[in-house]
Each structure stands twice: as structure tokens, then as C-alpha cells.
Curated annotation (Swiss-Prot):
<feature type="binding site">
    <location>
        <position position="122"/>
    </location>
    <ligand>
        <name>DNA</name>
    </ligand>
</feature>
<keyword id="KW-0511">Multifunctional enzyme</keyword>
<keyword id="KW-0227">DNA damage</keyword>
<dbReference type="InterPro" id="IPR010663">
    <property type="entry name" value="Znf_FPG/IleRS"/>
</dbReference>
<feature type="binding site">
    <location>
        <position position="164"/>
    </location>
    <ligand>
        <name>DNA</name>
    </ligand>
</feature>
<dbReference type="Pfam" id="PF06827">
    <property type="entry name" value="zf-FPG_IleRS"/>
</dbReference>
<feature type="zinc finger region" description="FPG-type">
    <location>
        <begin position="250"/>
        <end position="284"/>
    </location>
</feature>
<comment type="function">
    <text>Involved in base excision repair of DNA damaged by oxidation or by mutagenic agents. Acts as a DNA glycosylase that recognizes and removes damaged bases. Has a preference for oxidized purines, such as 7,8-dihydro-8-oxoguanine (8-oxoG). Has AP (apurinic/apyrimidinic) lyase activity and introduces nicks in the DNA strand. Cleaves the DNA backbone by beta-delta elimination to generate a single-strand break at the site of the removed base with both 3'- and 5'-phosphates.</text>
</comment>
<keyword id="KW-0862">Zinc</keyword>
<dbReference type="InterPro" id="IPR010979">
    <property type="entry name" value="Ribosomal_uS13-like_H2TH"/>
</dbReference>
<keyword id="KW-0479">Metal-binding</keyword>
<keyword id="KW-0378">Hydrolase</keyword>
<dbReference type="GO" id="GO:0003684">
    <property type="term" value="F:damaged DNA binding"/>
</dbReference>
<protein>
    <recommendedName>
        <fullName>Formamidopyrimidine-DNA glycosylase</fullName>
        <ecNumber>3.2.2.23</ecNumber>
        <ecNumber>4.2.99.18</ecNumber>
    </recommendedName>
</protein>
<dbReference type="GO" id="GO:0006284">
    <property type="term" value="P:base-excision repair"/>
</dbReference>
<keyword id="KW-0238">DNA-binding</keyword>
<dbReference type="InterPro" id="IPR035937">
    <property type="entry name" value="MutM-like_N-ter"/>
</dbReference>
Length: 286
């Protein structure tokens, strides 16, 4: 599943290509693309035409387009089109005569003639049109801030983590504590901070927990600079190009490879129906 850096890459692309433009029409081609919308695809199609995109925003793994009523001159957005990429979703900028993808699920036509395609092979992603509450789509208002958010309070997040007796990796994957972190970046930030994924959070000092969050910010900033992590053609930017941070991974997917710090072989253990990758020497469980 695309994590924070991959979603941010898409958000930046949509910002470049959509902000300031008016939506001429929208077409939802597959019911699963609007499965969470009351009224389904027709509800989106009927209510989005004529609106102008004023901003592209993100929180964690969710992104949304802020929409304003262009004819009225309204400048304060109160409506948003939420986009969740799911496992394989892509938001692509296309010319009108582009060959149609067999996995095209929905599309938007802009006033400059460009089309914005939602392509989703596995159909876990979706669009949702709804109200913004304090600038965030109502549907994801419960999602926590992420480590790249300027408003993120690392001290407060660290205190929240320390108050829990669960494994630190399990907590990092909880989007209501800190958002945007999935399996890849959890492994990478734990490796950088030298913390075992099964270490109980309440046994870590507040200072160590803040170091871990800073490690997450550092790792994701580097990943973002490289276009995110792409293991196949499903994770791409709005122009269809893949990122290359997979070449810089230190833990995730590195089973049997020497640790970049000490040379010990990286190991993989099953955790929460997925794998945890770590160095048994650098990341000792305490």
C-alpha cells in the first residue's frame, strides 16, 4: 500500500496540474470507486461539475482536493474530494486521446482539456465527496497528524506512545496515533533509531520515542526526495513514473543482507500478518 511519501508525491503532482482549474465533469466507471459515497458514483458526478480546485491537501495516507464554487466567487472551501489510493490506486494526468486503461475506475475532465484518471487494479481505493471539518474531510477527521506535518507535536505523540504497553511497531501502524506510516517506513525508522520492532513502548524513554519520530521524519523526507518507494508499476506519480527509494532501504525487504551499520544479517519475522525486518545486533529487544 502507498505510504506517506508515495501519497505526498501524488498530492504534489495534483497540486501542479489541478489547482486553479475548474472541473467540467466527472465520471465514475466502477461502483467500488464510490462505494463509501451515499448515492454512489452519480452523487459525485452530479455535485462536482463546475467546482474549482483550490488546493490539494494530505494527511497521512489520505489526500483530498479542496473545492470551491467558482461562479459564486466563494474563496473558503467547505467541500472536498477525498482520494484513498488503497493498495494499487493511481491518480494520473492524461490527454483526452490517451489509450484507455482497463483498470480506469473514475475520471475528471478539467477546463484546460486535461483528464485526471483514477486507475486502480485491485479496487481497494475510492473517492468520497463530502464536507470539510476544520479543513479536513469529515470521513478522515479521526486520522492523526503525520511526521511531516508542520503541526505535529512530537512530544505529545511520544507521551501517547509511552502510555501504552503494546509493541512499538504495532503503535506506529495505528493511524489514530500517528498517521502515514506503513510496514516499509516503520521498519526503516526503527532501524535508523536502533529500536526492536517488538520493544514495548512504555519501556522506552520519552527522549528515545522522540528520536524515533525524528527518524521517521528523516526517512520519509529522503524517500520523498527520491519519489517514494516503488516495487512494481503500481506505485507511480501523476505522470506514471516510479520512485527509487527502494534502492536506499536499510531494513525492509533486506532479509539476509548485511546491516549497513554492523554487517549482521537482517532478519525477517512475521508480525501482524506481515513481515518485520530488523538487525538483531543493532536493534536488541530490551
Amino acid at each position: 500500500m502507498p505510504e506517506l511519501p508515495e501519497v505526498e508525491v501524488v498530492r504534489r503532482g495534483l497540486e501542479d496540474h489541478m489547482v486553479g482549474h475548474t472541473i467540467v465533469s466527472a465520471t465514475v466507471l466502477h461502483p467500488r470507486a464510490a462505494r463509501n459515497q451515499l448515492g454512489g458514483g452519480p452523487e459525485i458526478e452530479a455535485n462536482i461539475a463546475g467546482l474549482r480546485v483550490s488546493a490539494a491537501k494530505r494527511r497521512g495516507k489520505f489526500l483530498w482536493l479542496e473545492l470551491i464554487d467558482a461562479p459564486s466567487g466563494e474563496t473558503r472551501p467547505d467541500l472536498g474530494l477525498l482520494v484513498h489510493l488503497g493498495m494499487s490506486g493511481q491518480m494520473l494526468i492524461k490527454e483526452p486521446d490517451a489509450p484507455i486503461s482497463p483498470h480506469l475506475r473514475a475520471k475528471i475532465e478539467l477546463d484546460n482539456g486535461d483528464e485526471v484518471w483514477f486507475v486502480d487494479q485491485r479496487t481497494f481505493g475510492y473517492w468520497w465527496l463530502g464536507d470539510l471539518v476544520d479543513g479536513v474531510p469529515e470521513r478522515v477527521s479521526h486520522i492523526a497528524t503525520d511526521v511531516l506535518d508542520e503541526s505535529a507535536d512530537f512530544s505529545a505523540i511520544a507521551r501517547n506512545l509511552k502510555s501504552r504497553k503494546s509493541e512499538i511497531k504495532r503503535l506506529l501502524l495505528n493511524q489514530e496515533i500517528v498517521s502515514g506510516i506503513g510496514n516499509i517506513y516503520a521498519d526503516e525508522m526503527l532501524w535508523q533509531a536502533k529500536i526492536h520492532p517488538l520493544q514495548r513502548a512504555d519501556r522506552l524513554s520519552l527522549a528515545r520515542l522522540e528520536e524515533l519520530l525524528q527518524a521517521g521524519k528523516d526517512v520519509m523526507t529522503k524517500a520523498l526526495a527520491q519519489g517514494g518507494t516503488s516495487f512494481d508499476a503500481l506505485y507511480v506519480n501523476v505522470n506514471g513514473n516510479s520512485g527509487y527509494f527502494s534502492l536506499s532501504l536499510n531494513a525492509y525487504g533486506q532479509t539476509g543482507e548485511p546491516c549497513g551499520r554492523c554487517g549482521t544479517q537482517i532478519v525477517r519475522e512475521n508480525f501482524m500478518n506481515r513481515g518485520s525486518h530488523y538487525c538483531p545486533n543493532c536493534q536488541k529487544r530490551r
